[in-house]
Amino acid sequence: MEGEEKQQQHKTEDDGIACVAERKVEIKNEKSPGKSTQHPKPCVDRRRVNYAKFIHTNARTYNEPVPYIDNKGPEKQRKWWFHNEAPKHVSQPSYDTKSVQRSDFQKPACPLVLPVKHSRMQKPSCGIVPLTSLDVSGEHENNFVEYISFIHQYDARRTPNEPIKGKKHGTFVQREIKLGAMPIVPKAPEVLLNTLESGSSEQPQKTDKGNSSGDKVTSPGLCQQNSQELLET
């Protein structure tokens, strides 16, 4: 009786699988009517596996049957079934830092003294080229003016078709300032005295030419007194 019931269950499952396959074929034929209809091949009778089943209630794939394997009795199949093994305690030797090789690479307790590769009496260099030191006095003043040159002096008709290196377009050029060409700027009291003296020398010339301004003529002594009062204030 039990064998007959199992056979009936197998038949119903096979009929359900065949119906699903026929429905899929019909849907494909409806989508492509021009193609020839291909009937599914009959299933080969194989040994029935009890733990191979189908899920018929799957909303993700619109209730299509999804095959799955029901793992029954993993305790009996422990030889091939995956299981976690307990970690084994591995004994490690004690770490000894008293050997010669390990003590060389340890951090020393006292501060290290680096060797001096230069004389301490030598002054430090400044700038890219060590030509000047920090203790230079103001005797050697900077008598050069740096500017950008826009002089080409380029002629394509000449055989050396290159401009002068020192006067290329956009290069930095230094021009020496000559001491004789520099204008001497007078101080403030000298400027006032020079202006007052020049005004006093021009006024008597105007009186000689016939200008009737005798009341407004001032002497140079009064001008000097006024300039001294201005400076004192």
Swiss-Prot record:
It holds the Pfam family CMIP6. Residues 1-14, 21-33 have a biased composition (Basic and acidic residues). It is found in: Cell projection, Cilium. GO terms for cellular component: cilium. The keyword tRNA processing does not apply. Keywords: Cell projection. The keyword Phosphoprotein does not apply. Disulfide bonds: none annotated. Residues 127-159 are annotated as: Mn. This is Ciliary microtubule inner protein 6.
